[in-house]
From Swiss-Prot:
Domain of life (superkingdom): Bacteria
Domain Exonuclease, first and last residues per copy: 7-170
Protein name: Oligoribonuclease
Family: Belongs to the oligoribonuclease family.
Organism: Pseudomonas putida (strain ATCC 47054 / DSM 6125 / CFBP 8728 / NCIMB 11950 / KT2440)
Functional note: 3'-to-5' exoribonuclease specific for small oligoribonucleotides.
Lineage: Bacteria, Pseudomonadati, Pseudomonadota, Gammaproteobacteria, Pseudomonadales
GO BP field: DNA metabolic process
EC id: 3.1.15.-
Recorded name of the encoding gene: orn
A Pfam entry, by short name: RNase_T
Gene Ontology molecular function terms on file: 3'-5'-RNA exonuclease activity; nucleic acid binding
Length: 180
């Protein structure tokens, strides 16, 4: 059910960090209410790219995405970047009106840069504001390092896992740092 207070969480896995030369290889979304309760999980999409594109990944991405099985899923996928964008927007339209939710996640500006370059319609679906959990992590590192250090992430570098961790991390900071 559409609600303008719902929050859209997104995570992308990419072949690297430069949106001009790297591409999105996996994406996932979760919609929560304003209290961070999960309402729905969107499609988890491995986006097809050629072996030539995948061969340009650096050592870290090659190792990480190979070990997680993502590289193989990308090779086997039949979903294009445009199809992934359309599927994701169709899911989001059920839960949040266009332009209402900030883009939510960890280091979300990086994801937004890739969306702006490769999936402009999806990037435009979000409000211009960002809800970046990394901001609280950086503040906690300076003002309450024990709070930051008490949250442990799994670091699977799979999009859906990363979103779930981002939501859990924000809950952690809400309880132990902001203390609401």
């Amino acid at each position: 059910m559409q609600n303008p207070q719902n929050l859209i969480w997104i995570d992308l896995e990419m072949t690297g960090l430069d949106p001009d030369s790297d591409v999105i290889i996996e994406m996932a979304t979760i919609v929560t209410d304003s209290e961070l309760n999960t309402l729905a999980e969107g499609p988890v999409i491995a986006i097809h790219h050629s072996d030539e594109v995948l061969a340009r990944m650096d050592e870290w991405n090659t190792r990480t995405h190979g070990a997680s099985g993502l590289t193989q899923r990308v090779r086997e996928s039949k979903v294009s970047m445009a199809e992934a964008e359309a599927q994701t927007i169709a899911f989001l339209e059920q839960w949040v009106p266009k332009g209402k939710s900030p883009i939510c996640g960890n280091s979300i500006c990086q994801d937004r840069r890739f969306l702006y370059r490769h999936m402009r319609n999806l990037e435009n679906y979000f409000h211009y504001r960002n809800l970046d959990v990394s901001t609280l992590k950086e503040l906690a590192a300076r003002w309450a390092p024990d709070v930051r250090d008490s949250f442990k992430k799994g670091n699977t570098h799979l999009a859906l896992d990363d979103i779930r961790e981002s939501i859990a991390e924000l809950r952690h900071y809400r309880e132990h740092f902001i203390k609401l």
